[in-house]
Amino acid sequence: MEQVVIVDAIRTPMGRSKGGAFRNVRAEDLSAHLMRSLLARNPALEAAALDDIYWGCVQQTLEQGFNIARNAALLAEVPHSVPAVTVNRLCGSSMQALHDAARMIMTGDAQACLVGGVEHMGHVPMSHGVDFHPGLSRNVAKAAGMMGLTAEMLARMHGISREMQDAFAARSHARAWAATQSAAFKNEIIPTGGHDADGVLKQFNYDEVIRPETTVEALATLRPAFDPVNGTVTAGTSSALSDGAAAMLVMSESRAHELGLKPRARVRSMAVVGCDPSIMGYGPVPASKLALKKAGLSVSDIGVFEMNEAFAAQILPCIKDLGLIEQIDEKINLNGGAIALGHPLGCSGARISTTLLNLMEHKDVQFGLATMCIGLGQGIATVFERV
């Protein structure tokens, strides 16, 4: 079976969804920009040699509809002979895109794929056009479709206090801002055109979603966002609304060597699981355990983790039950996470994987694990190994 390697991984800056940098930039343009940039950074691979493009996106309507993967590829002037497909596993969409491409390469059906994802939550809101089947209420609580309430449930079940959530959220912003100041994101962020507050066109090379002034004291003043009476989850301890895209060049190890391209990491194992929709945020725990089992590894073998921060109330139970609560500052989301950077749904799987690869190189560790919860009760995880 072919070994699957990541040759390169990039992303756009994360733009604020409400009146942010990309308010006049479409999702297809963010995607096409990364497709062009990834190919330009790796000229040894001709675009025509791509076997397929897998692109994650959740809200596949309006500008994100009608197979945005193909639309973006056409905008990027990728040769018409290269196919493209849009993948949807909600929050895990672009990580699923990576898994789909990896399996194609493992079986010999492909040698080189471009994968990634996008979500413009400012142009296509998360709830746009959603119409749940009324029959779901027979066996799934209505609140299971409300992500904030599932986070509240996890907080109650695992004893996650408001103070713990506020502290974790403040940490996310502090670490993301420190990473920005130290240029830790420089190798992954591709400068992307947008508009500043005055409407002037400029190139953005930083995440505008981060709030460096965030403190525990300021977060403590916010009201609960989802359960006004008994809740602890606030807007400040939830992932920010943002617009962005991320992309990865995935190849067979043999093809990468043929072309003289240096792989950055191997895909060691992959896993997807289901869980109760009412505690959808717990999905990373069984997904990570299954991915580690497939890789023949244990939690202690992993040098760094990227765990998507849907909510502080959601990620803290996962960290606790993976036995990592005492190692947060050594291993978990060292450059901040979605609370500070935002969670553009279809983008986030590729985004956290991209950040993870850079952290693995910076920390000089052999193994890294990226994992996410998924709305309606799923979890997804990928173990990467440095080459």
From Swiss-Prot:
Keywords assigned: Acyltransferase, Cytoplasm, Fatty acid metabolism, Lipid degradation, Lipid metabolism, Transferase
Gene3D superfamilies for this protein: 3.40.47.10
EC number from the UniProt entry: 2.3.1.16
GO molecular function: acetyl-CoA C-acyltransferase activity
Recorded family membership: Belongs to the thiolase-like superfamily. Thiolase family.
Record note on quaternary structure: Heterotetramer of two alpha chains (FadB) and two beta chains (FadA).
Job description of the protein: Catalyzes the final step of fatty acid oxidation in which acetyl-CoA is released and the CoA ester of a fatty acid two carbons shorter is formed.
Protein's recorded name: 3-ketoacyl-CoA thiolase
